[in-house]
Amino acid sequence: MKERYSKAILSIGCTLAVLALMAGAVGSHMVEEGLAREAFKTASTYHFYASLAIVIGAICSMLWQSSIWLPSFGFALIGIACFSGSLYLKSLGITDAAPLGPVGGLCIMASWGLIALAVIGGRNTTRN
């Protein structure tokens, strides 16, 4: 992947991580105690983990050449939207998106798995 794309994706991952941290902070003060707060906490935690996958993947894409990087980023983004998004909505009393949660969870797992495959099977770009 071209370096400028890796840098752009790295910036997106860092921005999403900041948003996850902000969501966690806001949720701990604004969401009522109980199941709603637990759902919000879980959403922000996995939002952060998926953002971290994007950050790590973007850095690794600068070191190993592979065609798997973009799908791994896509899966992480879909995972954040579906898994964390459905839990954020659930904590606000909106349960219509609940069926998307498992899909999002699988996408986050797929993202991490693809990162591992890209590193294992990718060509090291730092060697001459």
What function would you assign to each model-found segment?
Residues 1-2, 123-128:
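Short, charged juxtamembrane terminal tails flanking transmembrane helices
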Residues 85-100, 118-121:
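Membrane-helix boundary connector in multi-pass membrane proteins
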Residues 27-36:
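Membrane-interface helix-loop junction between the first two transmembrane segments
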Residues 15-25, 39-63, 74-81:
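Core segments of alpha-helical transmembrane spans in multipass integral membrane proteins
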Residues 37-43, 96-106:
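Non-cytosolic membrane-interface motifs at loop->transmembrane helix junctions
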Residues 49-57, 108-117:
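Hydrophobic cores of alpha-helical transmembrane segments in multi-pass inner/ER membrane proteins
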Residues 58-70, 91-94:
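Juxtamembrane helix-break-helix junctions at the cytosolic face
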Residues 2-15, 68-76:
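Interfacial segments of alpha-helical transmembrane regions
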